[in-house]
């Protein structure tokens, strides 16, 4: 297996223009495909998860032109649901942002579809979404294990009506249903069962649906009313915001070893909840400055925090590693859904933090971290999880090197992450 050893860094300084947001890119691509008219997406993310969505749309008969650097995509919308004259198998890798929304959208379509992916995708639950789709008239079959992909979908249309979705595991189930609902034959009311996790991701979904001309009535996140008979309208020029989760590594690096780092492409007007990460860093003692389209972080004496991170689970992983540089015991709470991401992130994070010398308690939905007086040089396993690789790169901001196994796994969202980090790093 390939590995990368990062030598100790004495200071971090500079500016990073963020790659496009994965969450925004895949939602906008799907809605652009269903819309009437053309949408030109700029600052699209070029990564594995987006490529899986683009390949699936091509198989489904969507025409698009992709620029040479793959960051501009002009999509000719179908103006309706997908139709396939022959059975199709769509391979979606480990892209939850493609699997869940496409599963819902294909129920509206005519045709027979199999949705599959890599082995980890077959361990990521989808039952709560399938239950809701079946309530609304969908024909969905599990091909291997109950409640998990691969799925076989026979497109019959969705008739809407009253539907209940369990929101306690992943907000992507609700996102998927919301995006399909305007094309159902009758009005849809979605009721949320359990506590809705990752609410800011629902805000992203609703915001993008509105940009494509569709209205949803959000009744305090407990119920959503979607009138039938709506059509998505091409959004013309659509700028994909920078990825706020990706920003977290650079902002944390500055908080630990700045100098200062300016990230551009997100700011105080961002639609992504993960910009709240900067507030968490500020609570730890970093100095943060906000602009409309940038965030600047500067070094501070970092102190431990004890916080509920349910609203920003992805960026919370970065806090877990920043905790190695903070005084006291850091507690990251209410992150059960780490367990159903690219890997079981609670178990993975606990294992790897212990390798560098931290004292860690791993609970069912929380993790507490006590930093060691001296970080140890360790070889970090990344579990085919892009965020594990990026998080643990921050260990090099000590006077200890760190070795990252399978560094190319960052290609899921940020293929040139290590190059960008090197540009900002001054070797010790």
UniProtKB/Swiss-Prot annotation:
InterPro entries: Enolpyruvate_Tfrase_dom, Enolpyruvate_Tfrase_sf, EPSP_synthase, EPSP_synthase_CS, RNA3'P_cycl/enolpyr_Trfase_a/b. Phosphoenolpyruvate binds at residues 22, 96, 124, 172, 345, 387, 412. Pathway: Metabolic intermediate biosynthesis; chorismate biosynthesis; chorismate from D-erythrose 4-phosphate and phosphoenolpyruvate: step 6/7. CDD domains: EPSP_synthase. The keyword Iron-sulfur does not apply. Transmembrane segments: none annotated. Its main location: cytoplasm. The active site is at residue 314. It catalyses: 3-phosphoshikimate + phosphoenolpyruvate = 5-O-(1-carboxyvinyl)-3-phosphoshikimate + phosphate. Its EC number is 2.5.1.19. Belongs to the EPSP synthase family. This is 3-phosphoshikimate 1-carboxyvinyltransferase. The gene is aroA.
